[in-house]
Amino acid sequence: MHHLHPMIVCIFVMYTGIVGSDAIAGDQLLNIGVIQSKIRSLMYYTDGGASFIVVKLLPNLPPSNGTCNITSLDAYNVTLFKLLTPLIENLSKISTVTDTKTRQKRFAGVVVGLAALGVATAAQITAAVAIVKANANAAAINNLASSIQSTNKAVSDVIDASRTIATAVQAIQDHINGAIVNGITSASCRAHDALIGSILNLYLTELTTIFHNQITNPALTPLSIQALRILLGSTLPIVIESKLNTNLNTAELLSSGLLTGQIISISPMYMQMLIQINVPTFIMQPGAKVIDLIAISANHKLQEVVVQVPNRILEYANELQNYPANDCVVTPNSVCCRYNEGSPIPESQYQCLRGNLNSCTFTPIIGNFLKRFAFANGVLYANCKSLLCRCADPPHVVSQDDTQGISIIDIKRCSEMMLDTFSFRITSTFNATYVTDFSMINANIVHLSPLDLSNQINSINKSLKSAEDWIADSNFFANQARTAKTLYSLSAIALILSVITLVVVGLLIAYIIKLVSQIHQFRSLAATTMFHRENPAFFSKNNHGNIYGIS
């Protein structure tokens, strides 16, 4: 397996339904609610060589008697040219910018071309390289286009100078051959023109739908196989079966989505489109099986439980591995993967899948568990201890023994089954052996975190109760703190106001004292001045005699 890593794993459906295998004890697993839904074979595929399809967008009409003027064909030609002009210009720009001689210059030209187009993804760079290679073989492509221009076959093989096989598909030529050629000489020109116009209009509508992304986006947008199917019509299966050789049938290859196309060239002269298709090569690995498992709930001592098994397993050489296929493309008949996702499984699961039911691990289910029944291959599997299982034909209620995990109902037991509000038509007979010697009473019940809802709910309830208690305590302390803070704030404000009041009063008293002192000084000065005015002689004598000793 180590040298298969460049390949891609593809799982192709070989069997469907309940089919037993060597390593897995399918019949015994049914008793505990494990159902094998599909068994697939393992295949590898790698990229194959490129193939080319030439699509002719205009039909070849037989020459008329010279009196008919088919105007609808000219109108279709003009409309189609307008429709494809952006795509033609886009391809021409890529080819022109990237047309250099050396490999290094060519790669640089691709980058320049992508920059000019405003795109830069890895997929588009790869697509641009393909267009460059096609442009290098422009002469061969033109010869190929010219060689198919005169043919009326819907599918024809053309081999160019490099021996590249291309399939020329003229998608509407069959319609023209069947509807026009036989009656071109007998009906009126107007009728032929109208008929041709209606066919061309329908096909033009399909072309508009197919190339919408290419018209509104760069030409490097890939075509899906659905677009190719619409474009090529009924000729596509013929093309695939004759040219795209694989180990898969046409329907399987188309549904896998692995077949995609890309427009690499358009001939404006002939209105032909060259599409490149890469087809993978498939190799089957003998003896390998990939099995899908469905696990429904089962009854254990009147309690609903579910067994722990992988959703998909790989059986090879009598060994079992887990195979999730998370990165795979799933179709109704295949699962295609880029790598092998096989991984070991626990010993208990291995023994359980081998039929040792006492090694199986179950987890309890509390609440509404939806996987209580499964309908596979015309037989109904249900946990009738957790569901109301009522048969409508013949009318009766299906009872399930306490020691049984599930009930298996086939057409012998009931032809129309009612599960709660669901109605099922039973169409098949259950052929497997139902093992009755295993009792769910002795089952190994283990509480696992992924499905142990009861413990999870209890843990959540405890956490919620603890959170509520903490919130209550927090609110109490917050209220206490709020009250204490309010009292402290009021006391502080009162103290500050008191201090401010005392300061203001002190300042007022000091101001009053100073004012009174100034008033006394002013009065004393005024009295002295009055005495001086009233006794001038006294002051004159005093000054001469210096009675007060003032110099």
Swiss-Prot record:
Transmembrane segments: 493-513
Positions in coiled-coil regions: 132-160, 456-481
Signal peptide range: 1-23
Keyword Glycoprotein: yes
Main location (coarse class): virion
Function: Class I viral fusion protein. Under the current model, the protein has at least 3 conformational states: pre-fusion native state, pre-hairpin intermediate state, and post-fusion hairpin state. During viral and plasma cell membrane fusion, the heptad repeat (HR) regions assume a trimer-of-hairpins structure, positioning the fusion peptide in close proximity to the C-terminal region of the ectodomain. The formation of this structure appears to drive apposition and subsequent fusion of viral and plasma cell membranes.
Assembly mode: Homotrimer of disulfide-linked F1-F2.
Protein name: Fusion glycoprotein F0
Protein source organism: Human parainfluenza 2 virus (strain Greer) (HPIV-2)
